[in-house]
Amino acid sequence: MTEFKVVHTICPYCGTGCGIDLVVKDGKVVDSHPFKRHPVNEGKVCIKGNYCYEFVHSEDRLTKPLIKKNGEFIEATWDEALDLIAGKLKQYSPDEVAFFSCARGTNEESYALQKFARTVLKTNNVDHCARIUHAPTVVGLGECFGSGAMTNSITDLAQADVLLIYGSNTFEAHPLIARSIVKAKENGTKIIAIDPRTTHTAKMADLHLKLIPGSNIDLINTITNIIIQEGMADEEFIKNRTEGYDELKDVVSKYTLEKTAELSGIPAETILEAARMYGSAENASIMYCLGVTEYTFGVDNVKSCCNLAMVTGNLGRPGTGVNPLRGQNNVQGACDMGALPNVFPGYQKVGEAYERLENLWETADLNREIGLTSPEVLHKAGEQVKFLHIVGEDPMVADADINHVEKALKSLDFFVVQDIFLTETAKLADVVLPAACWAEKDGTFTNSERRVQRIRKAVDAPGDALPDWLIVRKLAEKMGAGEKLNFESASEIFDEMAKVIPQYAGMSFERLGIDGLQWPCKTPEDPGTPILHKEKFLRPNGLGKFTPVEHKDADELIDEEYPLILTTGRIIFHYNSGTMTRRCDSITNEIDENFIEINTEDAKELGIKPGEKVRVSSRRGTVNADARVTENVIKGVVYMSFHFLEEATNKLTNSAYDPVSKTAELKICAVKVEKI
């Protein structure tokens, strides 16, 4: 007899956190539908969410542990694989091992992995892919406001009088958040877009500031200066709720309209109009994404946004705030869980909170030194770092300068990958562990607006695959430390998380229900916090901190040999390394190969016609792509996505990183384009 059931869960792709219902027939997921009354997506879904189930039962799912022998993978039992890993781990010191957690996995899994690293192996060398996207957000917002997360809720963006959309192609990267832009437009909201490309999002704007990549700080400082000079600053807010304003005024006063217009390529009158539009609004909201963070000055870019919002008093109310759109489904949660080298769960600093964590975890001698970030691990691989365990990340496609990544991974003494497919990264591993995907386990995700939501198991994992948290628990048992991770379920882990993480203290699986809760939620009666910083900031003194920032050049500038700026981003059909979306036939039928957007004038000068194959080269590598000749990119700039491993864009990109966040400069490098 045929059996059907419908399981409510959360989409596994971007940080929007859309509610979906999985349709299960005879133990297989056969369809998905948007959840009609979900508070985020309200019964709508994008193409990725609509077909998210299609990869679940792919024939190439990992089903058994694999051990590499003589260059070939051999199927193994869990005991064989975990005994081998545990034996290797016992050979290394805390400084010689490192772990990359997974922003695709659940909160419970990131919590378990970082706890294993810290309590069993005494290392803080724990990181995840926020490092290559929104680590500058965590640092910048944290320093200025006291919390490195979206200040407002997705739905209240539509209440803004002005939306400043900065470095975000929301309609393709976060399509259901883009519905708030549509609603805002219908409500009469004025929209300012800052982007070197004429994206679908920019086409909605009343003003489009087509900046030359690298002129970011100059532009925002100039807008801030105009607002101050023309008397649009909120003096009462500044006086009562901030500190450091005089220093900010001194710095931004040097950024003139004329100089910035020349540097940015934006007409002076357009910059002036944008400043007046934002500065005069009663409620103005800044939305930004990786076009702000993925620079060697990404932290300073974020701080400049904070300065602008505080100068105008646009915080603590609906339709205001500084709102980073987080990339992956649980990148916010992985940060919250302490899958970072400098903080324990709940952003408790490793050098300050160790006694509290030692008491809660019933352990001794937690490492008090800040660990290595993922770029630092790769730079020190084979030297200081001997052992690396990666859970659910594919840096061989997703990271900058993947030739450098490959060299680093091959130099390790021992390398473990835990994933649902044999990815490009997993192919280099000594041991590969088969994991359950999101539809095959229980747990929670935390979306971009700090909403903690339950995911629910719909089907069994294939073969011997296990949830990531259970794999980590079994490894702890092999290390003789099973009591450190003595969990029987995801809900048990969540209960411990609520004791450890102040922002989650009032939450439980039962309280999350269907709608979830937005942190901070500190007591069982607390309804959660849709808007941060209403009466005071989360810094110790309750004040927002102005942090003046100055222009910095990109690490790599154009020259005669490499005369074009390459910038990268997402397209609506695929996600990140394409590991999941490119196994969804309904999506790959739309597009399944890489392309490059090039300005009409640049194409004419190079003799390139639409649809022709071109060779794109940087100082690090070369790839081929189909040319899309268009006015959607400004002259001197080309654009590529990074979803296609066959002609991987990240062979070209630059691994130079922000000195504070260690985030690579994926948004700007120098290239040349040649007709093949």
From Swiss-Prot:
Catalytic reactions on record: oxidized coenzyme F420-(gamma-L-Glu)(n) + formate + 2 H(+) = reduced coenzyme F420-(gamma-L-Glu)(n) + CO2
SUPFAM superfamilies tied to this protein: ADC-like, Formate dehydrogenase/DMSO reductase, domains 1-3
Organism domain of life: Archaea
Phenotype seen when the gene is deleted: Deletion of the gene does not affect growth on formate and H(2) production is only slightly reduced. The fdhA1-fdhA2 double mutant is unable to utilize formate for either growth or H(2) production.
EC class of the enzyme, as a word: oxidoreductase
The enzyme's E.C. designation: 1.17.98.3
CDD domains: MopB_CT_Formate-Dh_H, MopB_Formate-Dh-H
Residues engaged in binding [4Fe-4S] cluster: C11, C14, C18, C46
KW Ribonucleoprotein (keyword) present: no
Cofactor: record remark: Binds 1 [4Fe-4S] cluster.
InterPro entries: Asp_de-COase-like_dom_sf (IPR009010), CT_Formate-Dh_H (IPR041925), Formate_Dh-H_N (IPR041924), Formate_DH_asu (IPR006478), MoPterin_dinucl-bd_dom (IPR006657), Mopterin_OxRdtase (IPR006656), Mopterin_OxRdtase_4Fe-4S_dom (IPR006963), Mopterin_OxRdtase_prok_CS (IPR006655)
Entry keyword set: 4Fe-4S, Iron, Iron-sulfur, Metal-binding, Molybdenum, Oxidoreductase, Selenocysteine, Zinc
Gene Ontology CC: one annotated term: membrane
Pfam families given in the database record: Molybdop_Fe4S4, Molybdopterin, Molydop_binding
UniProt key word Disulfide bond: no
Subunit note: Dimer of an alpha (FdhA2) and a beta (FdhB2) subunit.
Note: The genome of M.maripaludis harbors two sets of genes encoding the F420-dependent formate dehydrogenase (Fdh), fdhA1-fdhB1 (Fdh1 isozyme) and fdhA2-fdhB2 (Fdh2 isozyme). The Fdh1 isozyme is the primary Fdh and the Fdh2 isozyme may not play a major role.
Protein task: Catalyzes the oxidation of formate to carbon dioxide, with coenzyme F420 as the electron acceptor. In vitro can also use methyl viologen as electron acceptor.
Family: Belongs to the prokaryotic molybdopterin-containing oxidoreductase family.
The protein's name: F420-dependent formate dehydrogenase 2 subunit alpha
Source lineage: Archaea, Methanobacteriati, Methanobacteriota, Methanomada group, Methanococci
